[in-house]
């Protein structure tokens, strides 16, 4: 993990049009690290709906998981896991019901389950602040935003639903410092899906959208079905980047 002393901080702020953006306060010495970190930016505003549970420890620093409920434009909500350092917040307290604004990165890691690996995703929090009710954005589209700059690492899967809706699944690899990468599932719709369906492995993409949670069922036996939750990026904008030779 990157210690907080290596790079400048980032935070969610609003521009003159009251649009959420992420401000990156750079230090000249670490510009290359900043460039990598800028490949993966997420900002969400929501309500904490769980207590903290221990995840892991790195060099004596404990990291904990808490879930945040984020409203969609519809009546639905996304419940998104946050990965938070014990150095950012008192993880022994119960913050359920409190409104929070966080900025960070959407990260992944492989968790070994028997003979299989499971891709686990969460928002790695770099900055956070608690909000009063009157600070919550009126437009829900401004409470959940993500930007990714990465590469297609599996052939995209394009399909149509029984109702004729076009969908494409894209797995995007986003570079991280120290030779690591995050593998982020993305889902595109309509003309974005048609465009994504024709992309080749290795294509350089810039993706904007929101982080969403999606329930699904998985058959694990002849008669047994298990309910699971997937986390992915719902794509609103996708651009192909032409890399210089």
Per-segment meaning from a language model:
Residues 1-16:
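Single conserved hydrophobic/aromatic residue that forms the stacking wall/gate
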Residues 20-245:
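Single-stranded nucleic acid-binding surfaces, predominantly the OB-fold ssDNA-binding core
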